[in-house]
Amino acid sequence: MTGCSPVFTMQQVVGVSHRLVWRTFRGTDLLMTRTLCSPGPSRPGEKRPEAAALGLYHRLPELGRTLSHTIRNQAASTAKAWWDRYEEFVGLNEVREAQGNVTEAEKVFMVARGLVREAREDLEAQQTKLKEVRDRLDRVSREDNQYLELATLEHRMLQEEKRLRIAYLRAEDSEREKFSLFSAAVRESHEKERTRAERTKNWSLIGSVLGALIGVAGSTYVNRVRLQELKALLLEAQKGPVSLQEAIREQASSYSLQQKDLQNLMVDLRGLVHVGQDQGSGSPTGPSSPRGKDIDGLSAAMKEQLNHSRQVYSCLEGLREQLDSLEKTCSQMAGVVRLAKVPAHPGMVEPLDGALPSSLLEHGSTMLALSEMEQRLEAQANRNAISSTLVTCVTFMATLPLLYMLFKTS
């Protein structure tokens, strides 16, 4: 096989250019060399973006833990501050301080009791020893040399007994003093506890009274708003039929005028037709007179009037539908009025399941019922306002003496 078959080789050396060589079997280079520059050395103080991002990624958990710890400490400190304010306002700090004083006084009293017990035991032991010495002294003769030693020992033991008795009496006085301090601390603690209970009861009573007043005021406001909305609906219901009836009257008056014009036109047309027939019988072959043009004009006017009458009729049909819907609404309102009249007039109760009487659908009776309903609602609103005001005043006047007595006792 003859000819040159190309072989591609890539030589890559660090810091040396890349060369793409096209060699033949004879080893002759046939392709040019392309040199590439290696990246320069980086600065010693400069950080790569990858390293910075990796360091930030590793620091994120620690930052999250630090932030959560800071937030938790801040929330705990805020809650503790508010709780301390609440305890100071209620009086728990004073009660806790009084209980601490009671505990300290109890410890001091118990120490004093221990000292008294030890002094009594020492005095009793000294008295026992003194009794033994006296017994021995009674059994020994006064001429004996041991009598002087026993007398000296008795004298020394009497002095020791006197010292122990004085110490015992002082311990008893100290015990009584510590007991009085302990009793005073207990009484103070009980007084602080009773004061805190009274203060809590007073504030709870004041809060309940204020809550009742706020509830009464809120219910009064809500009732007033509802009554105003219902009054506005009644006013809208009153204004609706009046405007619609005025529109119906206007359309009816225009329709009656158009009917009169149409009747006059028909009368004129009949007269013209009779005149034309008379002229046709007198001169059947004569040329058309100006009367023919008048007849054409009148026929065109009549067609226009008929079209206008049809439009008016369609408008009246639409108004009739609206009037039907309005009558249904008025019937519903009349039913509501009758239901409202039931508590005031028990003898006027009638069945509402069937069709309402025709008199309730009339405009005058409906307007009268709506006006009565409006007056009844206004009277009810006034009664509710007066009753709520009276209840508030009576409650306030009843709580004033109680609050005065509570604060006076506290």
UniProtKB/Swiss-Prot annotation:
<dbReference type="GO" id="GO:0140141">
    <property type="term" value="P:mitochondrial potassium ion transmembrane transport"/>
</dbReference>
<feature type="region of interest" description="Disordered">
    <location>
        <begin position="276"/>
        <end position="296"/>
    </location>
</feature>
<feature type="topological domain" description="Mitochondrial matrix">
    <location>
        <begin position="36"/>
        <end position="201"/>
    </location>
</feature>
<dbReference type="GO" id="GO:0062156">
    <property type="term" value="F:mitochondrial ATP-gated potassium channel activity"/>
</dbReference>
<dbReference type="GO" id="GO:0062157">
    <property type="term" value="C:mitochondrial ATP-gated potassium channel complex"/>
</dbReference>
<keyword id="KW-0812">Transmembrane</keyword>
<feature type="compositionally biased region" description="Low complexity">
    <location>
        <begin position="280"/>
        <end position="290"/>
    </location>
</feature>
<dbReference type="InterPro" id="IPR037660">
    <property type="entry name" value="CCDC51"/>
</dbReference>
<comment type="subunit">
    <text>The mitochondrial potassium channel (mitoK(ATP)) forms a heteromultimer.</text>
</comment>
<keyword id="KW-0406">Ion transport</keyword>
<keyword id="KW-0999">Mitochondrion inner membrane</keyword>
<keyword id="KW-0633">Potassium transport</keyword>
<keyword id="KW-0175">Coiled coil</keyword>
<dbReference type="GO" id="GO:0005743">
    <property type="term" value="C:mitochondrial inner membrane"/>
</dbReference>
<feature type="transit peptide" description="Mitochondrion">
    <location>
        <begin position="1"/>
        <end position="35"/>
    </location>
</feature>
<dbReference type="GO" id="GO:0006884">
    <property type="term" value="P:cell volume homeostasis"/>
</dbReference>
<feature type="transmembrane region" description="Helical">
    <location>
        <begin position="202"/>
        <end position="222"/>
    </location>
</feature>
<keyword id="KW-0631">Potassium channel</keyword>
<keyword id="KW-0813">Transport</keyword>
<feature type="topological domain" description="Mitochondrial matrix">
    <location>
        <begin position="407"/>
        <end position="410"/>
    </location>
</feature>
<keyword id="KW-0407">Ion channel</keyword>
<feature type="transmembrane region" description="Helical">
    <location>
        <begin position="386"/>
        <end position="406"/>
    </location>
</feature>
<keyword id="KW-0809">Transit peptide</keyword>
<dbReference type="GO" id="GO:0071805">
    <property type="term" value="P:potassium ion transmembrane transport"/>
</dbReference>
<keyword id="KW-1133">Transmembrane helix</keyword>
<keyword id="KW-0630">Potassium</keyword>
<comment type="function">
    <text>Pore-forming subunit of the mitochondrial ATP-gated potassium channel (mitoK(ATP)). Together with ATP-binding subunit ABCB8/MITOSUR of the mitoK(ATP) channel, mediates ATP-dependent K(+) currents across the mitochondrial inner membrane. An increase in ATP intracellular levels closes the channel, inhibiting K(+) transport, whereas a decrease in ATP levels enhances K(+) uptake in the mitochondrial matrix. May contribute to the homeostatic control of cellular metabolism under stress conditions by regulating the mitochondrial matrix volume.</text>
</comment>
<feature type="coiled-coil region">
    <location>
        <begin position="116"/>
        <end position="143"/>
    </location>
</feature>
<protein>
    <recommendedName>
        <fullName>Mitochondrial potassium channel</fullName>
    </recommendedName>
</protein>
<keyword id="KW-0496">Mitochondrion</keyword>
<feature type="topological domain" description="Mitochondrial intermembrane">
    <location>
        <begin position="223"/>
        <end position="385"/>
    </location>
</feature>
<keyword id="KW-0472">Membrane</keyword>
<dbReference type="GO" id="GO:0034705">
    <property type="term" value="C:potassium channel complex"/>
</dbReference>
